[in-house]
């Protein structure tokens, strides 16, 4: 490292510059005539002898450092100032289109962030689909949350934590457990749930020391979290470390522009601010702050003048506008079959689960590194996607459920932010016309759910919903969700590193135990719990061998599962082993087909059968008694005869290399030597190195001949078995039958056939008995 003197800095002038400036000022003073009048007292002037001494002092360090500068690789140009030049270029580009230069740091920071994260020209797209790396981001603080992006995510609803929250329900994990046949959660209305219970409940028992702690807290205030006898370890530690009464719930409201228009057109006229310069007017002469529909008009529409009925109708309308329509829009968006499929696919990337894990293994590409925001795809290799694998049982279920809850929150907030930004004045004027036209129909609706559905048709039309569904959800890593979780906890006054709280701990699990302002969060929590079980993320269904990437969900099983789809398994075994050439055309252009890992992975990720996808219920393939509705086929080569022929060609080529080939043959996939003897041939006896080469070759040929005979007597293993109990070298895929197709198999591929017979041959060499090996070695002695 370079040693910088304390008085020097990157922006301060150096000592030679100071001396040069002083010399220039002294030379300029010599040009002034002696009789010129002095206009200003310059104060003390340095005598010539003292000034020469000053220059001598400044010259000594330069002479001492002259030797160092000759050997310094940074001495040419202002290398250390290059980062300042780059950053100044970015700032200059940010303010180039502005008529005035910003004078405050806040304004400049806002312009700087918008230029970086929300540029006018979208980033260039690379060949792999991700946007190119932006070197301009190097100068933005790494762990800072940019305000230009967080347009909707920074808003919260500070609300009192109900005593009926999930953290105060010791049997919450048991109550949230779902089994086969469970349906997607729905929504409710205030008419259906007129009474709310926010208490602790009769089934919950306080811990032994909870009463003593409560007496101590009476002087400081009661916490909403109460220690219970059935609390798990995480909640017990959480309740002892923090005392909270309120929580910052992320805002999930409809766009403020829309809600302001709805309130102004359906409920109460918005009051305009008072102009001080205007003359005072009679408040009765204006409609500001008055109901949109008067009692006389409502009596005429309903055909009754009963004050109680009129009051109930106003309550119904208020509940529909403030609570139920938000739930209705949210339920329409998330309950769509296409949206549910896309959400579950993104969750498979987030947790590196099921078919995504299988694709990563075969393609040798970490697909879970892909993240996106508002349709722009990025590759981030710093994210983590296997953190959930370190947890077990209830801790894993709580973490997975909370991650999906945050994922749904982020998705909804992103959509609401886009909706809010796209609305213009002309759109709001058209919305006001539609609301005014449907005023009578809304006020005379059948019930609260009917009014909310009709209002949702107006403010959340199908065209808007489809547009948002096409761009959402985004790919997110567990690291992004963890940062989002920490951001929420910090806004709630909780230090994430000192407490083990999850945002879903403060949400009730039932609508009847949740205050209506938090019903949207209750719905998202219940939906997250459903998606966790529907995607088979709550438990680890994987195993060994073919079961390594197994997942029971409808996206993976049976069509994307190597265990259930034998055609897909056969196709995966011939990846990179053949090349098909088509006939030459008139332009001497030949079309070739090679089944590369990339081509197969792309087709594998796109493989989806909507007929066997049950979005609104948990209906796993293993729980069904009927076969799948769509046939089980491969991804690229969908004809079984072609796959069987490719397997036969592959086996014939491998047998030829093993029996008649000369030289050293390497497997193109693993690099293994195909026609050399097993390492046991060379290491079984210390005297084998003195055996003549011809006798060694004869022994190896005899070994291969015996192994080929043994291979015909070994069958495949049980489905999902690791293979440890059926011969040492059977491997993960099981064994085949000496290159010949078994009865009932597809083109010699067998349902549980191994990757190749030559791997079995190499493995069988290691499984020879000690007696036979010793006899062969003793015969080879000179």
From Swiss-Prot:
PTM summary from the entry reads: Might be cleaved by the viral protease. Phosphorylated. Tyrosine phosphorylation enhances preferential binding to tripartite leader mRNAs and allows ribosome shunting.
Which residues lie in Gly residues bias regions?
A: 728-752
| Region described as Binding to host EIF4G: spans on this chain | 262-329
Keyword line:
Chaperone, Eukaryotic host gene expression shutoff by virus, Eukaryotic host translation shutoff by virus, Host cytoplasm, Host gene expression shutoff by virus, Host-virus interaction, Inhibition of eukaryotic host translation factors by virus, Late protein, Methylation, Phosphoprotein, RNA-binding, Translational shunt, Transport
Q: Which GO BP annotation is one of this protein's?
A: intracellular transport of viral protein in host cell
Region of interest called Disordered, as start-end residue ranges on this chain: 715-760
**Pfam families annotated for this entry?**
Adeno_100
Q: Name one GO molecular function term.
A: RNA binding
Q: What is its main location?
A: host cell
Occurrences of domain RRM (ranges): 332-450
State the compartments where it is located: Host cytoplasm
UniProt modified residues of type Phosphotyrosine: 349, 665
- What's the superkingdom here? Viruses
InterPro entries assigned to the protein according to its UniProt record, in alphabetical order: L4 (IPR003381)
* Induction comment: Expressed in the late phase of the viral replicative cycle.
Q: Which cysteines are joined by disulfide bonds?
A: none
Q: Gene Ontology terms, cellular component aspect?
A: host cell; host cell cytoplasm
**Which chain regions cross the lipid bilayer?**
none
Family, similarity comment: Belongs to the adenoviridae shutoff protein family.
Role description: Protein that inhibits host translation while promoting late viral translation by ribosome shunting. Blocks host cap-dependent translation by binding to eIF4G, displacing MKNK1 from cap initiation complexes and preventing EIF4E phosphorylation. Binds to the tripartite leader sequence of viral late mRNAs and recruits host eIF4G, PABPC1/poly-A binding protein and 40S ribosomes subunits on viral mRNAs, allowing ribosome shunting and efficient translation of late viral mRNAs even though conventional translation via ribosome scanning from the cap has been shut off in the host cell.
The subunit field of the Swiss-Prot or TrEMBL record says:
Monomer. Interacts with hexon protein; this interaction allows chaperoning and trimerization of hexon proteins. Interacts (via N-terminus) with host initiation factor EIF4G (via C-terminus). Interacts (via RRM domain) with viral mRNAs that contain the tripartite leader; this interaction allows ribosome shunting and expression of viral late mRNAs.
Further information in the entry reads:
All late proteins expressed from the major late promoter are produced by alternative splicing and alternative polyadenylation of the same gene giving rise to non-overlapping ORFs. A leader sequence is present in the N-terminus of all these mRNAs and is recognized by the viral shutoff protein to provide expression although conventional translation via ribosome scanning from the cap has been shut off in the host cell.
- The entry's protein name is Shutoff protein
What species is this protein from?
A: Human adenovirus A serotype 12 (HAdV-12)
């Amino acid at each position: 490292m370079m040693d910088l003197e304390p008085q020097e800095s990157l922006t301060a002038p150096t000592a030679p510059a100071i001396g040069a400036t002083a010399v220039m000022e002294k030379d300029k003073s010599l040009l002034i005539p002696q009789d010129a009048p002095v206009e200003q007292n310059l104060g003390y002037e340095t005598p010539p002898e003292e000034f020469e001494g000053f220059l001598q002092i400044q010259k000594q360090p330069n002479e001492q450092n002259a030797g160092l500068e000759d050997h310094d690789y940074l001495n040419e140009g202002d290398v250390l100032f290059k980062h300042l030049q780059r950053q100044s270029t970015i700032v200059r580009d940010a303010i180039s289109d502005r008529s005035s230069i910003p004078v405050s740091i806040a304004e400049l920071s806002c312009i700087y962030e918008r230029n970086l994260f929300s540029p006018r020209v979208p980033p260039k797209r690379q060949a792999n689909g991700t946007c190119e790396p932006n070197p301009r981001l190097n100068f933005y603080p790494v762990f800072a949350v940019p305000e230009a992006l967080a347009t909707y995510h920074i808003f919260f609803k500070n609300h009192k934590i109900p005593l009926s929250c999930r953290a105060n329900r010791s049997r919450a994990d048991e109550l949230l457990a779902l089994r086969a046949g469970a349906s997607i959660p729905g929504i409710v209305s205030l008419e259906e749930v007129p009474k709310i219970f926010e208490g602790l409940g009769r089934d919950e028992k306080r811990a032994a020391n909870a009463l003593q702690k409560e007496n101590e807290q009476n002087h400081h205030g009661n916490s909403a979290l109460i220690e219970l006898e059935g609390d798990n370890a995480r909640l017990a530690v959480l309740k002892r470390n923090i005392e909270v009464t309120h929580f910052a719930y992320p805002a999930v409201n409809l766009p403020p522009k829309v809600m302001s228009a709805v309130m102004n057109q359906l409920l109460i006229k918005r009051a305009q601010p008072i102009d001080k310069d205007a003359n005072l007017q009679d408040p009765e002469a204006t409609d500001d702050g008055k109901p949109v529909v008067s009692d006389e008009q409502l009596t005429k529409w309903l055909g009754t003048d009963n004050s109680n009925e009129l009051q109930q109708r106003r309550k119904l309308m208020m509940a529909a506008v403030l609570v139920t329509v938000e739930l209705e829009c949210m339920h329409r968006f998330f309950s769509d079959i296409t949206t549910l499929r896309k959400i579950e696919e993104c969750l498979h990337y987030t947790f590196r689960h099921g078919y995504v894990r299988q694709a990563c293994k075969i393609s040798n590409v970490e697909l879970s590194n892909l993240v996106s925001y508002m349709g722009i795809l990025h590759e981030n290799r710093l994210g983590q996607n296997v953190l959930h694998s370190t947890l077990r049982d209830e801790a894993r279920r709580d973490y997975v459920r909370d991650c999906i809850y945050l994922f749904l929150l982020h998705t909804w907030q992103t959509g609401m932010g886009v909706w809010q930004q796209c609305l213009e004045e002309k759109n709001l004027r058209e919305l006001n016309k539609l609301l005014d036209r449907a005023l009578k129909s809304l006020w005379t609706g059948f019930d609260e759910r009917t009014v909310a559905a009709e209002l949702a048709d107006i403010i959340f039309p199908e065209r808007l919903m489809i547009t948002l569904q096409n761009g959402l959800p985004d790919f997110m890593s567990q690291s992004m969700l963890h940062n989002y979780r920490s951001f929420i906890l910090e806004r709630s006054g909780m230090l994430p590193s000192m407490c083990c709280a999850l945002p879903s701990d403060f949400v009730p699990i039932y609508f009847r135990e949740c205050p209506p302002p938090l019903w949207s969060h209750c719905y998202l929590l219940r939906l997250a719990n459903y998606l966790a079980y529907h995607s088979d993320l709550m438990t680890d269904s994987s195993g060994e061998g073919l079961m390594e990437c197994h997942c029971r969900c409808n996206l993976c099983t049976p069509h994307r599962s190597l265990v259930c789809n034998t055609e897909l398994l056969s196709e995966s075994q011939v990846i990179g082993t053949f090349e098909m050439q088509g006939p030459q055309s008139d332009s001497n252009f030949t079309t070739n087909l090679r089944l590369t890992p990339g081509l197969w992975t792309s087709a594998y990720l796109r493989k989806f059968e909507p007929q066997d996808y049950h979005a609104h219920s948990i209906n796993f393939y293993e729980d069904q008694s009927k076969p799948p509705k769509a046939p089980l086929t491969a991804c690229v080569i969908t004809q079984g005869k072609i796959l069987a022929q490719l397997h036969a060609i592959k086996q014939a080529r491998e047998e030829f290399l093993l029996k008649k080939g000369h030289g050293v043959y390497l497997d193109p996939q693993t690099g293994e030597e195909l026609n050399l003897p097993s390492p046991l041939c060379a290491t079984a006896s210390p005297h084998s190195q003195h055996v003549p080469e011809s006798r060694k070759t004869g022994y190896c040929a005899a070994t291969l001949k015996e192994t080929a005979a043994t291979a015909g007597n070994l069958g495949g293993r049980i489905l999902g078995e690791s293979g440890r109990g059926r011969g040492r070298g059977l491997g993960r895929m099981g064994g085949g039958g000496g290159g010949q197709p078994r009865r009932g198999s597809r083109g010699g591929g067998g349902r549980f056939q191994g990757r190749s017979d030559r791997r079995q041959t190499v493995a069988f060499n290691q499984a020879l008995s000690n007696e036979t090996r010793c006899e062969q070695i003793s015969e080879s002695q000179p």
